[in-house]
Amino acid sequence: MSNRFAVILAAGKGTRMKSKLYKVLHPVCGKPMVQHVVNEVSQLGLQKLVTVVGHGAEKVQEQLGNVSEFALQAEQLGTAHAVDQAASVLANEEGTTLVICGDTPLITAETMEALLQQHEEAGAMATVLTAYIEEPAGYGRIVRNENGHVEKIVEHKDANEKELAIKEINTGTYCFDNKALFASLSKVSNDNVQGEYYLPDVIEILKNEGHIVSAYQTEHFDETLGVNDRVALSQAEIIMKNRINRKNMVNGVTIIDPSNTYISTDAVIGSDTVLHPGTVIEGNTVIGSDCEIGPHTVIRDSEIGDRTVIRQSTVHDSKLGTVVSVGPFAHIRPDSVIGDEVRVGNFVEIKKTVFGNRSKASHLSYIGDAQVGEDVNLGCGSITVNYDGKNKFKTVIGNGVFIGCNSNLVAPVTVEDGAYVAAGSTITENVPSKALSVARARQVNKEDYVDQLLNKKKS
């Protein structure tokens, strides 16, 4: 196997997207298009990877980091001109160079590997990735000679009747002998309507010089989809979503309604977990085995333990233990750590809190900036009052504490192990271990008060 290099074309603005966000940074299943391409290309054993950037160069470089070198195409003068910007990095190298667009998020490493192998086995100077489609209108046609090699690529508008009948099309992905590529780029002309330098012209140059130009026809046309507008973006999203869902189902995850379930490419889900309709799993989420998620649940960048149930709730940037029950309509906000066998019930919000094993907040509570021990019961309407309008303060609740309904714990405050707080209390001072704290006005009954009040209103 020869040395391998790759050039990703990511300089276009994407005018048809009608967006402030640069085209290749538009996400597909939660990840920018160009990141999908880089992740797949990086599996090919490359010696060097160069991403050609232009519009939004800094943002693209920030997204990709140090996994790629970068070349700047300050003025967009066509695809051949874009590749030529990588000359300072690659022109003197010997080997094979893959050229692919950064707006093809569905391409897989397997397809690109097959393309490279075809190129190397054929001893070609260039190899074109092609596909067969029944309705090829608008695509360049691949004309092969008697040896099966590429004779020429004919654009749809330039094709004759015989060529229009060809259903093998150019996908816009190529590999080249690296030295031949950069030698040919200087020969490409911009004598065309757009005044641009086009990469397919390199194919014609090499062919006219007597070199072999081969083609590899992929069976997976959907992988070659180029995203140029929001319609194509939605198509890519659907295809990627279906691919991810299928992979998870093959690995033992039950997805009740795949058309209404969204899973990020980086999520990991254990076997025998069930996902109900309306479930959205984003980012680097890890979900254990035998869980039940949804319906209508969002989990982002979180770790969920085995045998946990989350219904109609939201979990962000948090860690949940095993056998946890969440929801319905609960919200676990970032930096929360929920222990094992915990109950977080309906309309409970937890933020930046450590919540101990076997503890419960079953209804209508806000627990923020708190440390909750084990075997704690927080009654309906329990609130940690953590904010004074300027600063956040911490509430500490020990093991075995029982907080009565409709209680306010005004932070900073500590309720020590085994203490009880009476319903309706507003706690502003620490509660000692095993004490009962009552902080509410004493009840007063005024006999016959209602009759007196009504008579007063009548007079």
UniProtKB/Swiss-Prot annotation:
The protein's enzyme class: transferase
Positions of the UniProt region annotated as Pyrophosphorylase: 1-230
Entry GO terms, CC: cytoplasm; membrane
Cofactor(s) annotated in UniProt: Mg(2+)
Molecular function terms, GO-annotated: glucosamine-1-phosphate N-acetyltransferase activity; magnesium ion binding; UDP-N-acetylglucosamine diphosphorylase activity
Binding-site positions, Mg(2+): D103, N228
Catalytic activity: alpha-D-glucosamine 1-phosphate + acetyl-CoA = N-acetyl-alpha-D-glucosamine 1-phosphate + CoA + H(+); N-acetyl-alpha-D-glucosamine 1-phosphate + UTP + H(+) = UDP-N-acetyl-alpha-D-glucosamine + diphosphate
Annotated segments matching region Linker: 231-251
Active-site residues, as the UniProt record annotates them: H363 (proton acceptor)
Annotated region (N-acetyltransferase), positions in chain: 252-459
Manner of cofactor binding, per the entry note: Binds 1 Mg(2+) ion per subunit.
Pathway this chain belongs to: Nucleotide-sugar biosynthesis; UDP-N-acetyl-alpha-D-glucosamine biosynthesis; N-acetyl-alpha-D-glucosamine 1-phosphate from alpha-D-glucosamine 6-phosphate (route II): step 2/2; Nucleotide-sugar biosynthesis; UDP-N-acetyl-alpha-D-glucosamine biosynthesis; UDP-N-acetyl-alpha-D-glucosamine from N-acetyl-alpha-D-glucosamine 1-phosphate: step 1/1; Bacterial outer membrane biogenesis; LPS lipid A biosynthesis
Record field: transmembrane: none
Residues annotated as binding UDP-N-acetyl-alpha-D-glucosamine: 9-12, 23, 73, 78-79, 140, 155, 170, 228, 333, 351, 366, 377
Protein family per UniProt: In the N-terminal section; belongs to the N-acetylglucosamine-1-phosphate uridyltransferase family.
Free-text function comment from the UniProt entry: Catalyzes the last two sequential reactions in the de novo biosynthetic pathway for UDP-N-acetylglucosamine (UDP-GlcNAc). The C-terminal domain catalyzes the transfer of acetyl group from acetyl coenzyme A to glucosamine-1-phosphate (GlcN-1-P) to produce N-acetylglucosamine-1-phosphate (GlcNAc-1-P), which is converted into UDP-GlcNAc by the transfer of uridine 5-monophosphate (from uridine 5-triphosphate), a reaction catalyzed by the N-terminal domain.
Protein name (record): Bifunctional protein GlmU
Organism name: Bacillus mycoides (strain KBAB4)
